[in-house]
Amino acid sequence: MIQELDLAPGERARFISDIHFGHAKALAREPEELGFLLEGCSHLVVCGDLSETRESPCREEGLEKRARFLRMCRDAGVQPVLLAGNHDPDEKAGLLKLQGGRICALHGHALFREVAPWGWEYLKNKQVSRELIAAFPEAEADLLRRLELARTMSVLVPPVYTCSGTHQNKLMRFLAHSAWP
């Protein structure tokens, strides 16, 4: 789905992505650490991966922090605009057209048919991924089909990582996270 946003004179939008609330490697551990992003803007565009919404050990913590962050936005009078990423494919919009389409924003996962060809999800599920790609031949030339492929791939290929404190072996944890995100 495409979302449109036209800013009125004096309104400002700030763009961020890949916050990954709940994930062990997230740089911002708590939503309050990002309060400064809400200063001086009327809209905050999150270009995917605010938190993990797929079934995973990180989901519950990520959703709780996501809700707190969105509450912070509302309290600051900032309108959040959430776009789908590979970790939150259930967000409604995959593409934002700003100012009548002169500016477009999306999460980078749609740039690759494999979503993240360097990631564990693809490496552990190559056959399923290849079958999905074959089912979307129009995705080569049609952006909306590419976004649909990316969303489908993100939903059907399960996440492969752990949250902080859930993995005993530090070497294995390091190796599992070496291909972040």
Where in the sequence are the language-model features?
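Extended recognition/assembly regions associated with phosphoester-bond processing machinery
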Residues: 1-181
